[in-house]
């Protein structure tokens, strides 16, 4: 009776002027995202297939692919390991200066990439604080692929830490206590109780660090040495083609990077959806 006398009103939209905000959203996506990317794709149509294939498979370009993706993968693996350790320490331990350490984790986010590259070069070059100690032993960390990996580790670590940290904070301590009461060792508790919970977040952080490293330019060019076929990254190849007025070739290589970045974005979104299902978090 009450339901028939007072029919339920449709819920009001959270945002006032929904159609107006939707229009602004579509306009933003069109002007800032879709139109520039569409222009990139259409620019490649000026090339024949042979020209496109020659541009994206030249010896220097292939060498830059190997360095860019290989160094990004290695850096992401290192960040996955040390990012987990840093997140674990920040969540599970209290110590003097913890807030300072927690703030320093985000430093690569705020620091201009050029400043990061110059700082790493000054530190690791042959006349740097660390470089001059290692160079007599035949260890060179700057102006070669090692420098590329180090720069990518520096800029990618926060992605893993900030992805794993909230999952560790929300982990149920009761499960760990129950495992301990049942006779599990600390290692067994970590591998069978804690690790399965944080694996989705760890994979997401790995993918985000990898995606960030693939497109990195500013911090790498200062420490890489930029030697063709040795320490030349793909973004530098694109810049070089633009400086030589080879716009079609630069567009072709950029399209390859765009397709790969889009695939990475799909993988990251899939991992995040898996993480939400795994942890029971709302979508």
Predicted regions and their residues:
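C-terminal transmembrane helix and the adjacent membrane-cytosol boundary/short C-terminal tail
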Residues: 3-5, 20-24, 39, 97, ...
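Membrane-interfacial helix termini and adjacent extracytoplasmic/periplasmic loops
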Residues: 5-13, 49-57, 62, 98, ...
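Periplasmic/extracellular loop-to-transmembrane helix junction in inner-membrane transport proteins
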Residues: 7-19, 40-77, 92-93, 241-248
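Transmembrane alpha-helices
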Residues: 23-28, 77, 103, 107, ...
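Hydrophobic alpha-helical transmembrane segments of multipass integral membrane proteins
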Residues: 31, 66, 70-82, 86, ...
